[in-house]
């Protein structure tokens, strides 16, 4: 079956999902929404047969899609997702699900009310080597986990700077700036929680906000956690780091230490043994 899909937010994330859907064959792009003409034009070039426009509710009525991909500014995810559910559409939401616990609950309530499917697009679960590291830890290849660490180290200056071709104004909007702990830190947090599969019982955090001049929110976070199974964890998130090696979409993501070994950078290491590179299960 091929699902009719409307892309709500035609920036990089939305275009990537549209590309994957099209290549996979189980989705066809029938609608494109974005209030920014340049973004809409880029998507139209790839999907010329799709109905495009800057009125989201009107497009929902016109296109009547099976699925809506919500990939616009983070603070709009809740309203746009709920509107799609109320129009009878399943929803795939670019991470984060929402930017407040109240908005997250509103989405959950709308899903339960409509009975439709809602999923957050946590891509790291499907990417080598982090998926393979998580599966190896779940299989107890390193024994009992006592410490788990995740990182999102991403120089986002090109997205914050008006002089950059990658400038994304909503990220530095003074009223609704992107919370990088939610918008980027959700990658390591999600893969950590999936890997360890134990509830968090305690959490503590520090943050600062001076590494990105003019950014209207904190840009560096350290989060420390204790899990129900007595393991401890740490998350480091920064969007103000400086250097060419940090310009990819987040670095680090995961390290897992167990009583019988360690998983780090796609390798399984045990005392007195040569490290083994994990096999890519998607290859």
Predicted regions and their residues:
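C-terminal helical cap and adjacent loop that interface with cofactors, partners, or active-site loops
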Residues: 27, 281-283
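Hydrophobic residues in well-ordered beta-strands that form the structural core
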Residues: 70, 93-94, 99, 118-120, ...
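Beta-loop-alpha module in the N-terminal Rossmann-like domain of NAD(P)-dependent dehydrogenases
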Residues: 11, 17, 50-110
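Predominantly a Rossmann-like dinucleotide-binding segment in NAD(P)-dependent oxidoreductases
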Residues: 124-215
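N-terminal Rossmann-like dinucleotide-binding module
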Residues: 1-47
């Amino acid at each position: 079956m091929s699902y009719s899909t409307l892309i709500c937010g035609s920036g990089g994330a939305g275009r990537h999902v549209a590309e994957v859907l099209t290549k996979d064959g189980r989705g066809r792009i029938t609608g494109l929404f974005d209030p920014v003409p340049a973004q809409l034009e880029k998507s139209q070039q790839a999907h010329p047969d799709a109905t495009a426009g800057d009125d989201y509710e009107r497009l929902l009525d016109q296109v009547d899609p099976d699925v809506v991909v919500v990939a616009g500014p983070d603070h709009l995810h809740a309203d746009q997702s709920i509107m799609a559910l109320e129009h009878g559409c399943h929803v795939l939401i670019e991470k984060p699900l929402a930017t407040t616990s109240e908005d997250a609950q509103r989405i959950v309530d709308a899903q339960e009310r409509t009975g439709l499917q809602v999923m957050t697009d946590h891509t790291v679960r499907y990417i080598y080597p982090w998926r393979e590291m998580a599966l190896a830890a779940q299989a107890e290849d390193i024994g009992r986990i006592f410490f788990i660490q995740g990182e999102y180290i991403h120089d986002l200056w090109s997205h914050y700077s008006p002089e950059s071709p990658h400038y994304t104004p909503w990220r530095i909007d003074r009223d609704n700036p992107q919370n990088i702990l939610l918008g980027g830190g959700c990658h390591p947090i999600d893969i950590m929680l999936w890997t360890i599969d134990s509830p968090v019982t305690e959490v503590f955090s520090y943050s600062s906000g001076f590494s990105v001049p003019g950014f209207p929110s904190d840009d560096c976070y350290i989060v420390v956690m204790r899990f129900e199974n007595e393991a401890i964890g740490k998350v480091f998130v920064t969007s103000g780091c400086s250097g060419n090696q940090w310009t990819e979409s987040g670095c680090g993501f995961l390290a897992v230490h167990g009583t019988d070994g360690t998983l780090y950078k796609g390798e399984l290491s045990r005392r007195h043994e040569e490290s083994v590179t994990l096999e890519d299960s998607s290859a």
